[in-house]
Amino acid sequence: MTKVSKDKLSKYKELDKAAFEFENVKVKKFFDRSNLEGYSLDTTGFLANPGFFQAPHHREATSENDIAFVGCPLDLGAIGLSGARHGPKAMREGSRNYGPMNDVTGEIPFEQCNIIDYGDVEWSCTNLDVRVSEDIPLVFESLSSKGLNTLSCGGEHTTTYGVLKGLSTGHDDSFGLIQLDAHCDTMSTWGGDTINDGSVFRQAVLDGYIDPERTVQIGIRGRANFLWEFSHDTGMTVITADEVFEKGVEYVI
């Protein structure tokens, strides 16, 4: 067994002088700026701001903001799968112990753009169609008109229809779509409802929000494949889960 030399110990003690401080210059600069702006960040997770990745909460978004995180806590249309409404809360809670630096790239997103947590969509009533066709689009249309990019979190799949409708307002072109999912969600009515948890992207095509020929559905699997004929008939690119495993990520990209 070899004892550590005095020279090495001295070196280690020099490195230790910055203990409990942010030795990374990039991170220190970020935290210093946050403190100067009166916005203190917690690294322990116990006292963390409840915003997504501790982003500041701003209900009145402006053109100075670049990205807004928006929660859509809804699961009225997910028959037998209630609980998806807790998604936004869980995402915020789970993000508290991460950041501010991306551990792979070494970049700090909050230094590259102005990010806010808008909060959750407020529901005007308990009716699913109204929430999806009116409440959600209203929020995303407003944010889009101010030039913000949005990151939405559901909630069940029907929330995506509302997001697409809101973002489409004021745009002449239909969106291209990359969908990572187990199901295509292009079935017809379910229980008499045109917009439901399994028909989101069928209805989005019919209403002109997405272009099926520029839509790619990745990871499709399960016993309900016979319900997704609309995807194939309209020209969507459907890549099954088996294809992903057999051919790899590079093939998918």
Predicted feature residues:
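Conserved alpha-helical scaffold segments that buttress catalytic/binding sites
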Residues: 2-253
